[in-house]
Amino acid sequence: MNIKLFTHTDLDGVGCAILAYLAFGKENVAVEYCNYDNIDLKVSQFFIKSNPGEYDKVFITDISINENLAVAIDRYAKSGLWQLFDHHQTALELNKYDWCNVLIKAPDGPGLKTCGTELFGVYLLSSEGLVNRYNWTTINNILQFIAIVRDYDTWRWTTMGRDGIVSKYVNDLLDIYGREQFIDVMFARIRMYTDADFPSITPDEFLLLEQRKEEIDRYVIQKKEQLIRARDIYGHLYGYVFAERFFSELGNRLCQMNLGLEYIVMIDICNGKVSYRTTRDDLNLGTEIAHSYGGGGHAKAAGSTFDREYISDLVVKKLFETDEMKGAE
């Protein structure tokens, strides 16, 4: 069975890739990692160029496509080839298509917010025979991994005390190891460890995590001094800072340090990305802010992208191409 997976680049998106590998075998899954600025292009190119019958299933997880692309795919989705699983409010309109499953809260349980890994996992456990592929110890590890990813992605871990810190540890390990090595580590631990041990963070990993914590603390202090206050086009008071690392931690801590600001913007000028964070309940960053700039996301955490070369050219012109220099030419 050949599987194609388009998924997001964060822990939730990577979690979906790990579940796909577990369900279908790593050798049978072709994964393409996407952001908000390239998901439509990547999916449309695949849709146009792929040969009929080349793949048995095509999944889109933890990220969504635009309406025009969904309409085109819908003509071919009746065969069950395509499936989309997302949990972002900006994607709710896609639920009108039978092959799209967009939920904000978990289908079962006490009304907790869900994530792409959980939605995809429920499908794989019920429809793709994942339960029959492994023993119950491994299944319990899979369920535990899903909960860890969900609690981090929905930021629930911050309300769980010591029980929630494992979610942050796992997300930090993704950054420490890098995507491919992290996948290998988690894939092996899910299959090999007893459920009582999973995810079994090692002493060496705890040392790396402590070093990372100290590094984040220094970075937050540095960026706190660089924060600039402004008002957006809607009149919201926000703060922005140029940053390249630790976006979730930095954004939330800057929000806590600046309660008078409605949200925090982190601009990654080198990679053409913008991250938005808030701790308030009266503002939806995904639909009210990021969506206006071609992005999307959650109520309290969202993102968008920009043309890095265009912005870099503007900065260079402002800095160096003065009237005197132009006259000298």
Q: What are these language model-derived features?
A:
Residues 124-131, 150-157, 173-181, 190-197:
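Short, well-ordered alpha-helical segments in soluble proteins
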Residues 180-215:
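Long, charge-rich alpha-helical interaction segments
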